[in-house]
């Protein structure tokens, strides 16, 4: 990783015809999870996991040197129990990559589990890992969990801008997707520009997401909805 290839080339960001699968946004201008995953993986300075070597590393594609960086790695099972944790500190010279931590496979675990990598307490990278190659069906066994949601929306010029804060309880809140609706018609409001979406939170984690969209309706009709993979049905 990063020895032969140091970047990605995006061939098509959307479907040129409807039968082709694979896109970052669709014909309705709704953004898919692939965009946020790609953007996260392309952060110029971040902690990453190499599944081939099972090591966590530090990537710096900027032209600036960094010193005394903190990388914290944690492994959780599907029940949200912390199985393993390790912290290391490192420096990163400009345009370098280095592997720092061996990431173990937890004893006694079978199926899917989660690796959380955080650099300097910033928004972490969350990896879904599994002991069964290509088999993530055990994710369906995640305990039900609904994140706490706090919103703050206001009008600025011709747009609405604001934030959505998601907070997890004692369980993992998996693959949270934020959507904006018109209360009166029940229709999606599109396009909406989010700073992040399709968010996974480990127990006790929280994240604030900014959003912006055209002010084409009265503020009182705006409805923020968060769908989660393991959220109980209403």
Regions found by a protein language model. Give the residues of each.
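Carbohydrate-binding surfaces of carbohydrate-active enzymes
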Residues: 1-196, 202-211, 219-224, 232
């Amino acid at each position: 990783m990063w020895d032969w290839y140091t970047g990605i080339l995006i061939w098509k960001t959307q479907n040129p015809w409807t039968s082709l699968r694979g896109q970052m946004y669709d014909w309705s201008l709704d953004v898919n999870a692939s965009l946020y995953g790609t953007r996260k993986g392309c952060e110029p300075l971040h902690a990453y996991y190499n599944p081939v070597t099972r090591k966590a590393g530090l990537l710096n594609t900027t032209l600036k040197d960094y010193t005394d960086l903190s990388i914290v790695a944690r492994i959780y099972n599907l029940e949200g129990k912390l199985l393993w944790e390790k912290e290391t500190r490192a420096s990163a010279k400009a345009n370098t990559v280095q592997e720092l931590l061996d990431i173990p496979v937890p004893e006694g675990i079978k199926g899917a589990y989660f690796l959380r990598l955080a650099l300097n307490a910033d928004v972490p990278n969350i990896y879904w890992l599994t002991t069964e190659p290509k088999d993530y069906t055990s994710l369906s066994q995640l305990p039900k969990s609904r994140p706490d949601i706090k919103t703050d929306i206001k009008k600025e010029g011709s747009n609405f801008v604001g934030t959505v804060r998601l907070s997890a309880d004692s369980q993992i809140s998996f693959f949270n997707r934020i959507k904006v609706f018109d209360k009166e018609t029940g229709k999606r409001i599109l396009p909406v520009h989010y700073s992040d979406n399709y968010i996974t939170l480990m127990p006790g984690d929280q994240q604030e997401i900014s959003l912006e969209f055209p002010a084409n309706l009265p503020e009182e009709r705006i409805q923020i909805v968060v769908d989660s993979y393991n959220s109980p049905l209403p």
